[in-house]
Amino acid sequence: MASPRKEGNTAVLTKVLCSELDRLNEEFTYYHLYDMNIDGCIACRRCQQDWSGFNCFKNDDMQQIAEDILDSDIILFATPIYSWYCTPPLKAVMDRLVYGMNKYYGETKGPAIWAGKMLAAVTTCGYPPEKGSDIFEEGLERYCRHSCLEFAGMITEHHKGYNTVFMDSQKAEHIKEFVQKLYK
């Protein structure tokens, strides 16, 4: 989860998502990215020399995230949309993954070691989704094509203003239906 606010709108939706995964007896690992040490990618390409895994030389929390992704079937990103894209910690994760998981950038072009996995996203934004999160969704679609991942969709819930209540039963139902669609 890539929200700086642990009780914010994205966090509330993520709690519903996790509850639904529990109800469906799906195993998952939850990360709050703002609590983690994740450096940005520097495009050094050292990870390209070894195709056996993620293999970034940086000694931070990204190695564990990458290992868990390699052991998973579905990758779920949850982020508020700030300035039409994900928050900085998720962008750092995405940049590190695109190099470490896609062995395309070395002396010899290698495989996408995470090919075939599904990727989906849950987002919140202060604009209608077609004007607030559409650019991020397009970015995820391209990211998935490039990485040989299956883009399984994105759900965006709109917050209509700071003086309004965000969460309601309709939003909770949307998240539950989204999770059920992913895991059927």
Q: Which ranges hold each PLM region?
A:
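N-terminal beta1-alpha1-beta2 submodule of the flavodoxin-like/Rossmannoid cofactor-binding fold
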Residues: 1-79, 83-102, 106, 160-184
